């Protein structure tokens, strides 16, 4: 009696058979790593936390982003972000205060245990910082505020963030649009200064 070999098609995605031993790998960028700290982002979140009349939504967002990072002792000292987070532990909103306590405790614990372990810091070059200072100057004049005012810093940092942390065409056009509106639209300027128009919303609607 003849024998035949019958080949059946292999089913690729059979729901009946699962590979329990297989590992799933997820691609990660270097900036997504907990010990890789972009100093600009730390400063941006710091201004969000310190800006008067900041919305709860923005405070929670900033703290949640900070929770994903563990700055080195040097970054904590140079930016004073630890001091800012520490103050937020006494915030009147319980959710904000609780989140701030979590961030502060995690940072403090890690720093004490790994005091000699360096982190990777990403900083802007001098030319970029010079161009950004000029943008802050234009914004301060349009807002009729001093250049070192928190609101001026917050608007510029939000703009820089939305433009992928690059001094490019979109950044320059967005700054010009913001300055024009602040100079010629008194009602918008008043809303931004009072906090009734959140900085994030203001910048987003003028992004070019």
Swiss-Prot record:
GO cellular component: nucleus
Record domain TFIIS N-terminal: where: 40-114
UniProt-listed InterPro entries: TFIIS/CRSP70_N_sub (IPR003617), TFIIS/LEDGF_dom_sf (IPR035441), TFIIS_cen_dom (IPR003618), TFIIS_cen_dom_sf (IPR036575), TFIIS_N (IPR017923)
Top-level lineage group: Eukaryota
Gene Ontology BP annotations: DNA-templated transcription; regulation of transcription by RNA polymerase II
Ranges where the TFIIS central domain occurs: 131-208
Chief site of localization: nucleus
Modified residues (N-acetylmethionine): 1
Region (Disordered): 1-21
Cross-referenced Gene3D superfamilies: Conserved domain common to transcription factors TFIIS, elongin A, CRSP70, Transcription elongation factor S-II, central domain
UniProt-listed PROSITE patterns: TFIIS_CENTRAL, TFIIS_N
Keyword terms: Acetylation, Nucleus
Subcellular location: Nucleus
Family: Belongs to the TCEANC2 family.
Name of the molecule in the record: Transcription elongation factor A N-terminal and central domain-containing protein 2
Source organism of this protein record: Homo sapiens
Gene: TCEANC2
């Amino acid at each position: 009696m003849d024998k035949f070999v019958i080949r059946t098609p292999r089913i690729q995605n059979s729901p009946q058979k699962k590979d329990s031993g297989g590992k799933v790998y997820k691609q990660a960028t270097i900036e997504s790593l907990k010990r890789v700290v972009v100093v600009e982002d730390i400063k941006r979140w710091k201004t969000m936390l310190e800006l008067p009349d900041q919305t709860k939504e923005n405070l929670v967002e900033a703290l949640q982003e900070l929770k994903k990072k563990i700055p080195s002792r040097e970054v904590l000292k140079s930016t004073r972000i630890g001091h800012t987070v520490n103050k937020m532990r006494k915030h009147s909103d319980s959710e904000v205060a609780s989140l701030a306590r979590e961030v502060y405790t995690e940072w403090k614990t890690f720093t004490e245990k790994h005091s000699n372990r360096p982190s990777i810091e990403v900083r802007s070059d001098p030319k970029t910082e010079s161009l950004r200072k000029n943008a802050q100057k234009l914004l301060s004049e349009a807002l009729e505020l001093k250049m070192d005012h928190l609101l001026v810093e917050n608007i510029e940092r939000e703009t820089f963030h939305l433009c992928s942390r690059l001094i490019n065409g979109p950044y320059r056009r967005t700054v010009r649009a913001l300055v024009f509106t602040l100079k010629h639209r008194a009602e918008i300027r008043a809303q931004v200064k009072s906090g009734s128009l959140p900085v994030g919303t203001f910048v987003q609607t003028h992004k070019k």
